[in-house]
Amino acid sequence: MSGSKAESEEKAGSKQCPLVQVNEYKENEHIAYTSLRPIQITTLRKTAKVYLYPFSLSNSKLGLLKLSKSPVVNNSSKSVVHKKKDRKKTRRKVLTSKMKALSSKADSLLLKSSVDAYTESTRLGPKRTSDSATLSVDAESSDEDSAPGLDDFSGLSPYERKRLRNIRENANFFASLQLAESAARLRGMIKKRESPESKRKRPKKKENEIGCRRSMRLLKVDPLGVSLPASPTQPTLVEEEENPLLPPGPLEMIPENQDDSSELLKASLKTWAEMSQTSNEKTKKGLSSIKSYKANLSGMVISEATVRKVTKGAISSVALHPSEVRTLVAAGAKSGQIGLWDLTQQSEDAMYVFYAHSRYVSCLSFSPTNPAHLLSLSYDGTLRCGDFSSAVFEEVYRNEGNSPSSFDFLNDSSSLLVGHWDGHLSLVDRRTPGTSYEKFFNSSLEKIRTVHVHPLSRQYFVTAGLRDVHVYDARFLKSRGSQPLISLTEHSKSIASAYFSPVTGNRVVTTCADCKLRVFDSSSISSQLPLLSTIRHNTVTGRWLTRFQAVWDPKQEDCFIVGSMDHPRRVEVFHESGKNVHSLWGECLVSVCSLSAVHPTRYILAGGNSSGKLHVFMHQET
């Protein structure tokens, strides 16, 4: 029996886990090692025995280690379990108020000691590697060892004492690193770099350097280098107006371009006054064919003798005297001048310039009943009649508040219809004494550029506004709220002019800034005027040129004439259907003729440009 027990015990002993023995480890102190940080030497002086036991983590919340219920391991692990229970009980103790106070006091004392140690280490300098801290496994594992400075805290738990000891050791370790001294040493090694400043070198002055040439006139020095005396200061003069307003009332016909020409002027005026009114026999016979009309246009030429500068500024209106004997052309300028040129006389004295107005002369026309009367309208608010028989410019109408823009004759040459820039209309009777209007009407247009009366039905007239063309009946005009009979709204931009055909009035031609010429059928004035044709034509004259205005030819009522921007410079003739009939051009025509006037019976055309020159196309005399 005893032998069997011994065998069983041996078997049980053989099943126990083998013991693992860890040999003692020591660092080799003979190895040469250079480091910036002090070497920390750790010496293990005890032999640690590690027992491996199977365990399971079943309660992660409490962190308890549950050993397996193996009968072989049960006896050997009792001592380990009792020790763990004792440690847990110690950690779970609640600190009293006195112990908490002691703990806070210990923390402050340790922190103070660590700061003092760090300061002392900085003062003394670097220590040798032999003075490094030595840690042992026994000191770390033992919770009961006493440390200097902790005698007053005997009431603390081993855990608190160990925590305070670790704080002190960490403070001593960081003090041994001497970080402050290393930082100061590095600052001394770093040299401050000076900011690079780009210093510009001043150019060296040359002793014999030649200076720039300067105007001796501006320096007020004569060629010999002698300074000139200072010029006396002149008093500033107030600049007078270029064209001052003329006094109201009649003005004498005194030419501005001739000094002593009273006898010549009287002779010319007498000749113009004796001009008989042209007969309308050719017009009454009817219109010629397009073929013959085109042939007559081909015979019209321009020469140096038919080109003359008659005004100071740009020409703003042109009129041809209806005489069949003499060729007399009148031109109004933007400066207010009126030029008269008699092409029948070949001398230089055949041209006269008069100052009848002080501003832009927008409309000029000879009286249909008395060709010796030349009527002119200006932006200065006056309408005057130049009487060649009396050599006087009589004042017919004055309205400086509402600047007039255009006029036309009504039933006879004594009654005038005047359009204003603000959209009003005035009825003026030349037979009434005074310079005021008879009636004053308000149209439906914001502005009125041109006014033209129907040649047969004199009660109708057409007006060109900003973007619309209106046809009115003079019998139904009111002082306020006058409504047109017909409104032509096909235009998309500003309108320059609108005119009835001169014989029958069956057509209306308009000139618009949208580069289109439009012809309307006005044979039956009803609620609407049908659009017959639209002609593409460049009407963009710009700022410095007078705007184009298409005018009918009384000799051929279905054709009209307009200036052109094309090269070579020309004046174009169009049929009402839109077909180009003929173009008048020549070597002497080198500028744009914006405005044109046509003789009612003779093949004569006069065009004016923006430099004050008249260009006349006519048949050559054989």
UniProtKB/Swiss-Prot annotation:
SUPFAM superfamilies: WD40 repeat-like (SSF50978)
Gene3D superfamilies, sorted: YVTN repeat-like/Quinoprotein amine dehydrogenase
Top-level taxon of the source organism: Eukaryota
GO CC terms of this entry: heterochromatin; nucleus; site of DNA damage
GO biological process: DNA damage response
Gene Ontology molecular function, alphabetical: enzyme binding
Quaternary structure (record): Interacts with CUL4A and/or CUL4B.
Purpose of the protein: Specifically binds 5-hydroxymethylcytosine (5hmC), suggesting that it acts as a specific reader of 5hmC.
UniProt protein name: WD repeat-containing protein 76
Source organism per UniProt: Mus musculus (Mouse)
Gene behind the chain: Wdr76
